[in-house]
Amino acid sequence: ATLYIGTVLLLLPMKMPYREESTAKDASPLSNLMEGMNYIFKKRVMFRLMLLNFVRTGVFAPLLLLLPAYTSEVLNAGPGIGTAMMVSMGIGGVTASFIMSSWGFFVRKGLVSLITLCTGSMVFTVLGLSSWVALSVGIMIIMGLSQSHFIVSNQTLVQKVVPDTLRGRVSSVWHYEQGLIPIFSLVIGLTAGLIGMGRAMTIYGAIAVLLGVMYLLIFKDIRELD
């Protein structure tokens, strides 16, 4: 909470020399949402960026919610191992933040989004196959690196592509996808109840890997974004 308050205080002295008059107040929230959705569906690059984030939300985001069941059923371990996995993921995320803030991206941001979607999905798949605690804990560092790089690169490209007048509307749609996390978690959980957590994670991870590789091959316009 202190860090959030500190961030807000640091934003207060910022000066914004350029600003366009907002048009959102002239319409209802629903019409603003529909306007953002229409823009996303009409502009192919934006739709593809949103699609990548949709897959990321469906695979990466539910992982933390699944850890208690995963550590108990797949690893036959206690809650301490789940905590260790979360810590490892946090280490990866902080490391990614340090790398991006210090040196930026070493390749184009669009390519970063596509590659990290694949690597994060691979981690999800490996976790489903793993029964080795050390592997499961260690590989979460890669998940943290992948997720942080994906979110920053994908969101940066969204902000770069969208016009100023629609930035708030489109960003809202991007964040609305976070509301789907409980649904994705429910689907994975129900599948795990039928075939086991390990198999469910392996299947969902493999599907995400296939989608990621397919997007990497066919989304040339995304690969070239920087």
Each model region followed by its residue ranges:
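Alpha-helical segments in transporter systems
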Residues: 48-57, 174
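Juxtamembrane intracellular "pre-TM" segments in multi-pass secondary transporters
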Residues: 17-51
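C-terminal transmembrane bundle of multi-pass solute transporters/carriers
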Residues: 3-5, 34, 41, 60-226
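Helix-loop junctions on the cytosolic side of multi-pass membrane transporters
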Residues: 3-27, 217-226
